[in-house]
Regions:
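Membrane-embedded and juxtamembrane structural elements of multi-pass membrane proteins
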Residues: 1-196
Length: 196
């Protein structure tokens, strides 16, 4: 044996300490992200406690600045009082599509997966891509075969609500890459039914 070789090998106790430290750092990161998301969700719940139900089945109050869907098991759609007419109908269809697709359940699950892998940038990239495609799918359902004028109104609504800050814990209408969403909507054509 070479002199000093025994002294250069890591001690079993020190390796254990490194793994414990890494596990503690990982757990702390997960806890911080989940507590932050839970706090945002609770803040939103408090904000809409005075919301009243509207004839179209949504909820509204003065504190609601942008359309969003909140809740996992019994999701509710919240709309600003100022949103009326054809843009409101399109936005409502967008939010109802989120509920029909199960997005209020799948988005928190994707977020949880990203939190568990918080140290990995690819996990966050995948989460952002999921959010983007989710919004595009709901946009497509909202405009369907709408004429150009209604499509322009809908795009204007996206731009209007994109300036409102992000709301963690909710499916907010203005989320996503705005320029990409608007460009996609302006080019979108509803696919023709497949003939067999």
């Amino acid at each position: 044996a070479l002199p000093g070789a025994a002294g250069s090998a890591p001690l079993p106790g020190s390796m254990f300490n490194i793994w414990v430290a890494l596990a503690a750092i990982w757990a702390a990161g997960v806890v911080v992200l989940l507590v932050r998301a839970a706090a945002g969700y609770c803040r939103l719940r408090r904000m809409v406690t005075l919301a009243c139900k509207t004839p179209d089945g949504c909820y509204t109050c003065a504190a609601v600045a942008t359309p969003f869907t909140l809740g996992v098991l019994r999701p509710r759609i919240y709309m600003p009082q100022s949103l009326q007419g054809s843009p409101r109908r399109a936005v409502l269809l967008h939010e109802r599509t989120h509920i029909r697709r199960g997005d209020p359940i799948t988005k928190p699950l994707y977020y949880l997966a990203a939190c568990l892998h918080w140290w990995n940038p690819l996990a966050w990239l995948a989460f952002r891509q999921f959010e983007q495609y989710m919004e595009l799918a709901c946009d497509e359902a909202a405009i369907g075969t709408a004429p150009t004028a209604e499509r322009a109104d809908y795009c204007e609504s996206i731009l209007r609500f994109a300036t409102v800050r992000q709301m963690p814990g909710a499916l907010a209408f203005g989320q996503g890459q705005v320029a990409k969403r608007v460009a996609h909507l302006l080019k979108y054509r509803k696919p023709a039914p497949l003939l067999l």
